[in-house]
Structure formats: structure tokens, C-alpha cells
Amino acid sequence: VLGVQVMTDPRLREQGLGAMEGHTADELEPLPQPTGVHPADVRWAGGESLADVAERCHSLLDDLAARHLSATVLVTHGDTMRVLLGILDGRSHRDLDWDLSLTNGSVMVRNVDLGKLH
């Protein structure tokens, strides 16, 4: 409709939550935090860690930078968006902005030179 190319990429999928998927927070029992490991590096209930999500987000951004696109719109999910915003703002997956309100349909805008991320 707008004359733009639409592409899908599995690296933009939501964080995999393993055995916790399909359950509400009230249905889940709290899991003990492993000693000596940052919570963002834990694969809770067999799912993905935030480190895993950050790895695929870095890969995606590297690929986008290599394409030298003038503008890109990314559509993704909550935790993945939070990780992407953290990367674009120069933060680690261990230091994400959990106070940032990301509701369904949120639009976040960043003007970034992807070639300068590293």
C-alpha cells in the first residue's frame, strides 16, 4: 500500500518463556534465583534469558547496519522491544528500563546511526 518492502524476522519474536508460557502470573509459583547469576542471564523455566534476546537483537541490528538503510520501522513485542531500546540507548540487557511503560501498540521512536552502535 505504501510502496515499502515488508520483511519478517524471527529475531523480533517475543522472549520465549518456556514452561511459563500460557500461564498468568497468578498461576505460577515463584522460582528460586540461582546463586551467582544475574537474573537477566537465567533461562527461567527452560525459556530464553534476556541475554539470549539481546544476542539476537544485536545480530538483527548488525544486519540492518550492513544494509545501510535510510529508515527502518521495527515491529516487535514487549521484552524484545525493551532490549532493543536498551541497546540503542547504550545499556546492557542487565540494565534495562523496567519503568518504561510499554503497552500494546506502543510506538517508540529512536534516531540512531546503526554503524555507531559498537
For the regions a protein language model found, what residue spans apply to each?
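Active-site catalytic microenvironments for nucleophilic, acid-base chemistry
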Residues: V1, D63, R67, I87-R91
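Generic beta-sheet signal
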Residues: H68-G78
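Domain-level recognition of soluble alpha/beta enzyme cores
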Residues: M7, R91-L117
